[in-house]
Amino acid sequence: MGKARAVGLNHIALEVGDIEEALAFYGRLFEFTLRGKSENAAFIDLGDQFIALQKGRKQPSDDGRHFGLVVDDKEAVRQALAAAGVKVLPGRFLDFLDPWGNRIEIVGYDNIQFTKAPHVLRGMGLARLVKAPQAIKELAEKGMAPD
């Protein structure tokens, strides 16, 4: 029997101090809808994926450990971070720490190989998103160019 092949991520779980505070914080930065919510968890919908916010962060802030959150407008996030008084971390990427120490890198959809299926983008109201030529070239080199 062969090994299973990893094909993607279903969700990311972030530990936060308080669910309502976390929803308010992330709501200042991003437009989103919830899949569900309880006293100890909330689920931010990303189409065919989600972010699970879980109450109970106890560890220190992340240093190098992070995840890249893909957005439709990276500059809008940069402006929202500034307006919210959130410090962008030094370096060439758009990284920040949330109030609970979760490190998040903001990545623009157009410039990376990550691709949502057209029907998922339509369902999210983002059918207008397209890839930059370099991202299409990188996908084509792997035999994955969009139609």
Name the predicted role of every residue range:
Residues Y26, R57, L81, P118:
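Short, flexible helix/strand-to-coil boundary loops that buttress conserved ligand/catalytic motifs
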Residues A4-V7, A13-I51:
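Core segments of cupin and vicinal oxygen chelate
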Residues A52, E75-V77, F114:
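Residue-level signal for secondary-structure boundary sites
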